[in-house]
């Protein structure tokens, strides 16, 4: 799926359906705590939950997203001004070594081969030496499970615009050429207050499964790396 079509999907979810990101809040709050009180760039703003959590922790938070509408809404809600920019991960509009941390949560799986490598290199460019890259991707996703068909053109596509699936080895292979101390772990993040009792029981089972070394379709791969 090309960048224009990806943009259509995410412009819809971020501007017309920001409520759809509620299940991601636990994951985003975790990443905000990991980034800490630093100058941090979040790539892909969703409903702004990461930015809100980072500001509450005292971070100097910046945001980048291809959706101008989502950026305008975030600026208005959190008073970020020029710290929130519309743009691409392959051409980040901040100077070399500007950030202590870059966060990319549920971003990499949307990128084609060339864009993925270019984005990785841009993350490294805007991080200071020793700065940290943090993020998540779906764990071992079966892409076909989320394939849908357009009823107008009959073209099949991934409902969220995912281009690839990752396992820990694939993430390490991607990041190691530009980053040191690459670490990957499988985690289940649960936003408990969004669930009824049945959902909570299911979430407990998923967390327990991953804790004993199993795999869950609801899990994420949490990665951290340092700019050399």
Enumerate the language-model features and the residues they cover.
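Acceptor-substrate binding/catalytic loop of class I
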Residues: 153-170
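Conserved N-terminal segment of class I S-adenosyl-L-methionine
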Residues: 1-95, 101-105, 114-120, 186-189, ...
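A SAM-dependent methyltransferase catalytic signature shared across enzymes that methylate proteins
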Residues: 170-186
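A short glycine-rich, Lys/Arg-flanked "PGG" loop and its adjoining helix->strand segment in the class I
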Residues: 117-129
